[in-house]
Regions:
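Conserved beta-propeller blade signature
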Residues: 38-39, 88-89, 139-140
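Short loop/turn segments immediately following the C-termini of beta-strands
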Residues: 3, 35, 43, 53, ...
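Structural signal for beta-propeller blades
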Residues: 8, 46-48, 96-98, 147-149
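Blade-level signature of beta-propeller repeat domains, shared across WD40, Kelch, NHL, RCC1
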Residues: 126-155
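Loop/turn-rich, solvent-exposed surfaces of beta-rich toroidal or solenoidal domains
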Residues: 71-105
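Gly/Pro-rich loop segments of beta-rich domains
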Residues: 4-28, 54-78, 105-129
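Residue-level detector of Asp-centered blade-edge/turn motifs that repeat once per structural unit
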Residues: 32-35, 82-85, 133-136
């Protein structure tokens, strides 16, 4: 990608709304890693996609098994974060949880926050949206429908 370029460069999707590997349906949040690979929470396809730099199509790195709450599924994924080990964190909005996908287990994720019924308790979320980490590894979650941001200490 060129510094100072005035025109946008297509890096993901751009082939109309759909669920093909070269399409997106309501791309919500993005994460770009150090290699300039682009991760996209493909909200209405209930998946997270990864486009390697220069690729014409992406591949599914989480979800993509239809809307649902199984460990292989997402329901309107929002905020995403990828750490230096390639571990993917997803704010799974419709399921009121945050999930983690490791490089070792790409088939299903692990619930690390929430996953209980939607609510206002300290261990509950209501449509989590954005997420981020601090230098100490604490997870911050924008708990959208509860109008709050929560911090979690995770392993």
């Amino acid at each position: 990608y060129q510094l100072g370029e005035k025109n946008g460069t297509l890096v993901a999707g751009g082939n109309g709304e759909g669920n093909g590997l070269n399409q997106l349906n309501f791309p919500a949040y993005l994460f770009v890693d150090r290699q300039q690979n682009v991760y996209v929470s493909d909200n209405n396809n209930h998946r997270v996609m990864k486009w390697n730099k220069g690729a014409k199509e992406g591949f599914v790195v989480a979800g993509g098994q239809g809307q649902g709450n199984a460990l292989t599924q997402l329901y309107c994924p929002n905020g995403i974060f990828v750490d230096t080990l390639g571990t993917l964190y997803v704010a799974d909005g419709g399921n009121n949880r945050v999930m983690r996908w490791t490089q070792r287990d790409k088939k299903q994720g692990t619930v690390i926050v929430g996953g209980n019924v939607r609510g206002e308790g300290a261990n509950q979320l209501s449509y989590p949206a954005g997420l981020s980490f601090d230098r100490e590894g604490n997870l911050y979650v924008g708990d959208q429908n509860n109008h709050r941001v929560q911090r979690f200490s995770i392993e």
